[in-house]
């Protein structure tokens, strides 16, 4: 692969994603990281601002264009830790090198769904047909196959209701894609909800092949307990097909601090908003889990706005942590 595909997904200064940021020194490899690492403007001595006007929001108060800590999955806010980069690259290599099954696991809220969206965004539609399949609890075998077939925009013939018939339709669709020069890439999110029967359906899909190559790649994203479940002997055949695996873990204190700063900058803030000690408190109370960080920081911004606090400090983080 030429270059780093994940780097290409992170917005740069050329698309106005960081409007208002001063020009960086020539030759710096990453102007955004230069800004993150640079000393922040000194905080004002006073920590309280005048009372809010009736129409003012916490975004205006903190000089933000949008909420940096919303729970929606937005690739523009992806902060590239080494751990997330590793997962992305492993899943990408599985696709590009015709590995039939690969898996990323991690605690809830560590960024698995965001990785699925980055893969969906990155994969070349001329070479691949990537589909994200969101698994729901108690989804049946036929329900799973119908979901995949629907994502392929294939109308089911009347009378096709059983697993065998659905698998035949899917296999024919995979062959058609192959003849077009494309490969089906199935990205299964929330795989910890898959039943044993559905796991064996995925194994069957992974067996669609020609003598020269595999014709599908299935990427499984699940909570950490799913990997424990697959250790049971009944899943030996499935587990042995998984050549690529990755594990997402909570962020370190350093990564957590950079994550918060990065998201604030993407949202339009160009100076320090969280005091350094407050960033340490964010990591301590969130455990370094991305979703928990977002919840705590968003609550801190709202609480800080109501208290007219121009910066987020440790006491404010502690108050908000007690509310979670």
Listing of model-derived features with the role each one plays in the protein:
Residues 125-136:
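Conserved catalytic segments around the Walker B and adjacent sensor/switch elements
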Residues 67, 139-158:
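Conserved NTP-binding/hydrolysis module of P-loop NTPases
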Residues 2-48, 258-261, 265-324:
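C-terminal alpha-helical "lid" subdomain
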Residues 120, 226-241:
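Short regulatory helix/loop adjacent to the ATP-binding pocket of P-loop NTPases
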Residues 150-152, 224-225, 233, 254-270:
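Conserved AAA+ ATPase "sensor/coupling" helix adjacent to the nucleotide-binding pocket
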Residues 135-137, 230, 243-255:
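Conserved AAA+ ATPase "SRH/arginine-finger" region at the nucleotide-binding site
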Residues 99-118:
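Walker A/P-loop nucleotide-binding motif
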